[in-house]
């Protein structure tokens, strides 16, 4: 008897990718075969993203493609909270579940394509690390669900709820399994990594027989014992973040912080319902770099937020010149259904949003170009991501996968994905580095 086959598509950010991995791991444990071909599958699961309108449009398009090619489609993920919208566009979907409803997704799959009764999970073992959708040498490590912030442009709390931290022992045990399976880089993710443990008052859990506090600093210290790269994403600049800089300076955690500042104008930050301490943030960035000179700072910003004036925007550009961030993403404000910001006065015209976005990107490109040029001549560690006929492409400690730059490596000896090599940097541009392997 052949195993039932499930087609799967995962949309959205890394946090959604981790949800997809969890669903796929459960299905594989029950004997399902995962196939990339829709027309070869007994059912297709679409894990959607519903954060902004463009993501919703992409999700609806993906659902439509799956229906056209297969006909039997189950929808899950963030957009699942808008079941009426999905069914209005695609009334033939078999089931719709929301984010984090893993068991409901699996039950829906059972209803369409029941698992084999003769499946023996002890003979058809799933890898200890579970099913991963990333390359073998890096993996996302989700430490919590939900968020306690109520930013006016965001609907994540209404979709995913308040912050719920995973037990620290579970997180560290998963990290151990990943490292044993060959992972060389752990990317710590959540909606708010720096708030880890606040919902349970930072109570201690146990890992390898010893207590570990459920708190970002203690988690990072424990992860450093695994001997692989640990990269922190989605960190808010709370005071205790200063403690992690010491771990970075000591080489225990990658000197990389992904902090979603979103803006710099105090007036706009208040409208966004975000902390408006841009002057203190600049002072802290200066202290962080004094303690850890190799620190890389990444952030994302929104331009064209309702009420943003030219003065607010210029304030942001001036702040960027002072902050000298290394890696930056920027988005034009887009209304999100259900977000409080939709009701704010003085929306910014689309042509002004576009013009400000272009000026912002040009401004930051100059900063990025200058900062990367200082790396020429230095020796850095590079984790190889891919190799083809043109050479090897990897990342340094300053580069997260998918969102940051790359290091193009010239090597006389063959390389493969997952190799960690020493490289002397020979050239740079706005986003990337080039170098020669020296060890």
Curated annotation (Swiss-Prot):
Gene3D superfamilies: Methylthiotransferase, N-terminal domain, Nucleic acid-binding proteins, tm_1862 like domain
Entry's cofactor comment: Binds 1 [4Fe-4S] cluster, which is coordinated with 3 cysteines and an exchangeable S-adenosyl-L-methionine.
Binding site for [4Fe-4S] cluster: 147, 151, 154
Entry cofactors: [4Fe-4S] cluster
Molecular function terms, GO-annotated: 4 iron, 4 sulfur cluster binding; aspartic acid methylthiotransferase activity; metal ion binding; protein methylthiotransferase activity
Localisation per UniProt entry: Cytoplasm
Domain Radical SAM core: from-to ranges: 133-370
One term under GO cellular component: cytosol
Catalytic activity: L-aspartate(89)-[ribosomal protein uS12]-hydrogen + (sulfur carrier)-SH + AH2 + 2 S-adenosyl-L-methionine = 3-methylsulfanyl-L-aspartate(89)-[ribosomal protein uS12]-hydrogen + (sulfur carrier)-H + 5'-deoxyadenosine + L-methionine + A + S-adenosyl-L-homocysteine + 2 H(+)
Annotated MTTase N-terminal domain residues: 4-114
Lineage top rank: taxon: Bacteria
Domain TRAM residue range list: 373-439
SMART domains assigned to the protein according to its UniProt record, in alphabetical order: Elp3
EC number(s) recorded for this UniProt protein: 2.8.4.4
Any one biological process term the GO annotation gives: tRNA modification
Keywords carried by this UniProt record: 4Fe-4S, Cytoplasm, Iron, Iron-sulfur, Metal-binding, S-adenosyl-L-methionine, Transferase
SUPFAM superfamilies, sorted: Radical SAM enzymes
Residue ranges the record marks as coiled coil: none
CDD domains: Radical_SAM
Leading EC class: transferase
Role of this protein: Catalyzes the methylthiolation of an aspartic acid residue of ribosomal protein uS12.
Protein family per UniProt: Belongs to the methylthiotransferase family. RimO subfamily.
Protein name as catalogued: Ribosomal protein uS12 methylthiotransferase RimO
Organism from which the protein derives: Bordetella bronchiseptica (strain ATCC BAA-588 / NCTC 13252 / RB50) (Alcaligenes bronchisepticus)
Gene: rimO
